[in-house]
Curated annotation (Swiss-Prot):
Domain of life: Eukaryota
InterPro entries associated with the record: 6-blade_b-propeller_TolB-like (IPR011042), EGF-like_Ca-bd_dom (IPR001881), EGF-like_dom (IPR000742), EGF-type_Asp/Asn_hydroxyl_site (IPR000152), EGF_Ca-bd_CS (IPR018097), Growth_fac_rcpt_cys_sf (IPR009030), LDL_receptor-like_sf (IPR036055), LDLR-related (IPR051221)
Glycosylation sites: N97, N273, N657
Mapped LDL-receptor class B repeat ranges: 398-439, 440-485, 486-528, 529-572, 573-615, 616-658
Protein name from the UniProt record: Low-density lipoprotein receptor
Phylogenetic placement of the source organism: Eukaryota, Metazoa, Chordata, Craniata, Vertebrata
Record's signal peptide: 1-21
Organism: Cricetulus griseus (Chinese hamster)
Residue numbers carrying Phosphothreonine: T724, T732
Post-translational modifications: N- and O-glycosylated. Ubiquitinated by MYLIP leading to degradation.
Pfam families: EGF_CA, FXa_inhibition, Ldl_recept_a, Ldl_recept_b
Amino acid sequence: MSTADLRLRWAIALLLAAAGAAAEDTCDRNEFRCRDGKCIASKWVCDGSPECPDGSDESSETCMSVTCQSKEFSCGGRVSRCIPNSWRCDGQTDCENGSDEQGCAPKTCSQDEFRCQDGKCISQKFVCDQDQDCVDGSDEAHCQAATCGPAHFRCNSSACIPSLWACDGDDDCEDGSDEWPQNCGGRDTAAAWSSSPCSSLEFHCGSSECIHRSWVCDGSADCKDKSDEEHCVTATCRPDEFQCADGTCIHGSRQCDREYDCKDMSDELGCINVTQCDGPNKFKCHSGECIALDKVCDSMRDCRDWSDEPIKDCRTNECLDNNGGCSHVCKDLKIGYECLCPNGFQLVDQHRCEDIDECQEPDTCDQLCVNLEGSYKCECRAGFHMDPHTRVCKAVGSVAYLLFTNRHEVRKMTLDRSEYTSLIPNLKNVVALDTEVANNRIYWSDLSQGKIYSALMDQAPTLSYDTIISGDLQAPDGLAVDWIHGNIYWTDSVPGSVSVADTKGIRRRTLFQEKGSRPRDIVVDPVHGFMYWTDWGTPAKIKKGGLNGVDIYSLVTEDIQWPNGITLDIPSGRLYWVDSKLHSISSIDVNGGNRKTILEDEKQLAHPFSLAIYEDKVFWTDVINEAIFSANRLTGSDVNLVAENLLSPEDIVLFHNITQPRGVNWCERTALPNGGCQYLCLPAPQINPHSPKFTCACPDGMLLAKDMRSCLTEVAPVLTTQGTSTIRPEITAGAEGLPKHKEDQSASSTSRQPALSTVESVTMSHQVQGDRRNEERPQGVGVLSITLPIALVILLVFGAILLWRNWRLRNINSINFDNPVYQKTTEDELHICRSQDGYSYPSVSMPFCGREEAASKLKDRS
């Protein structure tokens, strides 16, 4: 090989090496190159959190060159960051320098709104209503005595209510004066109302609620009026006993013994349990003593076994030999050594440091968590943007509103209270609430009316309400809307049921009903096909099941007493609920794991009723405090008062498009409308990739046909009638628009069941079971009329056979022959039958003998 060839090859090798080195120093197009050469994602540059080890991704030189997009606002300043334009002048500071809330024009209130002194707008109806709705109280200043119209009743507190609400057995005035006997013609309307839906195992509060009887006189008020703690005899404990917070007594030695002996766990509160030799300045001898660390290796025996003075280990630095075998940091001790790890790493096998996956903790980040070597990174889902100031994922899009019930109305309020109005006024006793954001529609249930209503949000103040469900409702305490498939779900605590209907109320079905259960609130996840509801029956629980009513089971059964409101944070996949007895807010993932108590407070959670989740906040209503509070949904900190001076606030929902993500309605993706279902098409739970997308359902009392789409009702059979005609069981279709299905008929006459129309199907579905019960008695009579004659005939035949056999035995002579050789009686019997002419010999059949041989043998024997 020539010298020129060698030089050429060396040049090519050098070029390839240089290209490889350059490639290593070059980051991808969507990456940012730190000063030390490390590559990070470009979206992490100037986001307020340094990802480069040298911090170059957050330096002022780097961030000053960032250009915001047209839909973004530049915070400016030393570090220019970008935020969505919708966050500009929204009442919340998002830029570190506050520039997004500077130079904002004062909010302009509409004609039907009142402007508070702090610039916030509230509904004109809230002015001089004896409730302070402005934070500064300016809406109740300079008010004159209220004058009620002719169609209104004036409460003793001067408030006005519709006359129809007076003397109806339900307190509508805050002081209850609308039900006083002197205002109701001397009638005691409370007596008529005393027949409450409380069971024998429940206590009826003076404020009309039902609570467990075991909660009476337990030291904690559970009724709104605290009537469950009136006239209680307080237990007195002996001097050597400890009194629990609920009044019970335990032996004094059981306090602070690291075991819960009180039901309320108060015996372990405030205990300080110190373990010997804990702390870096303590040394535990092998013989059990505990000495100060400075006495180790001081050439003095302080331990009985001299374990504090090992000659070999004292003054020996093991870290000098191969770093002590430690992968990162080796720390020499007076006796021995220990391996240490930097932040973001944990020690495994006593020597090696391993990266900590912080993302395994469910609440490490607000939404998404990206694990990095020795660290982690928080990100936001689509539709959210990271707030550079608070590091919280904030929703991008329309303005978020809180909608909540206030007994006689539904109110609407922005999170910063800049807008506060009455959305649906003049209601009787609204309890449950939910919305359909895409259609701008609101749904609510009225406990006094026993109905479920609906209205468009922009038309809600008018009287154009749609009645969705108007029959067979007793206590519809919970309501949830499936915004993907167009269905509503509700609970009824009196029959203990969970039901579903389409949003027009035409088709309806009971999915769950159990004796002793008290379903309260319900939430749905139509994206994955599940529903969850609280049940404060005995025992209390949280249940989970498919939206089609299948695979229902208890998700939470421990440390739960009075679960009330429940909500679902779909982005994080976690359930949140309030417990009115435990005064707590808790969360758990949708599979029942990673449970966490977020907040526990008897004052701010005196009687929580419902809750809602939005961004990093949890909002809840409290009927005793008559207020709405908020707190951080991850830590329970930063508790704030959102609204106060309310009248029995119960349900609360958050209205924003991000709370109801889009999904696929598989019932409309098939060639046949409504998924080919004759009645209801309900989404199926997506338990695994092979799960069906939906299943068909029928009204109560009807069954699916073999095609699993049509609905059938079975007519009670009447097998015999007068004459020769027979009537066979018939199965007919139970809804309009599809052909009837019948069993094969061979009878000369049949009875028909009228087909259900789509309008009448709901009513019919609830009558079918009653009709069946009414038919049980005639059906039993028909069965008896068939079986008794058959039994008599069988007895007669059996008796005749016995009589014939008895007569036959009396008229037959049997002769046995003894064999003299074997001394054995033969088994052959000769029957000589008596006839009119004397005796006759029947033909004899003998084994292995023909007829002639048998005849000859008979002659020989004779």
